[in-house]
């Protein structure tokens, strides 16, 4: 990508790499109780098991898909028009919102009327919506009224990943179908640390979890383009990807490209953390083209409005920013309302002080005015805005540790307690909440973080940045944090915020975004396996079976990154014939453990004996050969 290329709305195009279907994959839609509930999944077709392994059909497997219409060949993608709006009929039929004449925030009106921005602006013809006076349009409010919304049914179907149909197809696949279904459906019992994961996710279970505050569906009424997803301890672990420009690099086009690239590889949510030029316009382009929820940190943009002087921030400026972003369709706001004046001195003893941008902004404001922040003082006013658009809180950990030296200190844990108190205030308004967490934490202190969060924040979903388990690896912090992410996901964190290799070093590009996503997909999936999430092991079992049967293309295609797997294999064995070979370049044809195992099984079958008997008999034969050869360990050639 070129540095800061000129972006023009009239010539904006989609990233061609992001709209190619993944190998041997088809986008399918599972219909719910009504025709307009169409839940996307990715169907990965497999080849048959070769006759040499006892021929059998291998039905397609189904995996969770976050790429929206971008990987659907039948969808017409034009980022200048944005995506279709599948949620709009659901929002309208509830009859609890009104269409506004246009933006109502001062800043939104100002940007709309600025002729210099015409060539950058996304030309949205739809007007923003807001709750009718006295109404609450949050998914939590509906859940507490006993209402199962289409969004709730959608995520229930999505979480089950068509598992029942897959196992049924296996049973019908041939004479060995029942045995095969049992084999592929088998998984190790997990340790869920008190989570309540059901055998099957139902719409009623989704409703009850949202009503209790243990899960959220981030879904602003002004973001009808999204395919609903759920964040909660009793659901699949999700991942968030951060994108956004800075004052020195990136353009609108590049950020839209990063978003489409992130969701291709499995980003469940995306946060736009832009701090550079045209924040408002960049966000509009991202939201209108995003099928996943979009989050922001509104204080970043508010700071730009006062030329970077934290002490000049006011409640009025911040309130206008919240309304501006809510009317654009932001699904969740990170708000650092837990940074209290009394906590700031506690950070003086730290190795790395306050490392959160939002936290440092609010700490500076508190010290400059010597009082609690307007975020804390106006928290109930913020709740009124959130429930008018169904924006979820992501209560920010402004005092998170920026080094393992500072992990689990009094500032971090004091703020956590305050976030729990704010959670209960938000719930009083039926506003959805998740809690942000650290940060940098050594492995032996990670579980304490999770246990304290569950206790003090009343089981609201936890959303953590890693945590990084060591500070010695700049350039590899996707790995140092992936270790902690897998652990804390197992203990109960609902969503993991990815870290890219560029963490602490620079703004990530597309390659870094993919590396971060894949690392965190691994961590999230490992956590699902460890928790014993029903059906989580099906993909592992399918890949392992393909590996044992030397179905190379199936191995590549079932994996998280088919392109990388195929590239690595082809570096040493590039010919098509190698895709059916019963060995790889690691061990070669004579030392492949799986090939040897297959030979043992074939020998046992021919002799009419068990595999254990075959191994014993083979050892006896080799012993006789050894004695006959002179009992020398090393034979002369």
Curated annotation (Swiss-Prot):
Record-linked Gene3D superfamilies: 6.10.250.620, Radical SAM ThiC family, central domain
Residue positions binding [4Fe-4S] cluster: 584, 587, 592
Example GO BP: thiamine diphosphate biosynthetic process
Residues reported in the UniProt entry to bind substrate: 242, 271, 300, 336, 356-358, 397-400, 436, 463
Name of the top EC class for this enzyme: lyase
UniProt-annotated binding residues for Zn(2+): 440, 504
Reaction(s) this enzyme catalyzes, per UniProt: 5-amino-1-(5-phospho-beta-D-ribosyl)imidazole + S-adenosyl-L-methionine = 4-amino-2-methyl-5-(phosphooxymethyl)pyrimidine + CO + 5'-deoxyadenosine + formate + L-methionine + 3 H(+)
PANTHER family: PHOSPHOMETHYLPYRIMIDINE SYNTHASE, CHLOROPLASTIC, THIAMINE BIOSYNTHESIS PROTEIN THIC
Summary of subunit composition and partner proteins: Homodimer.
Family indicated by similarity: Belongs to the ThiC family.
Stated name of the protein: Phosphomethylpyrimidine synthase
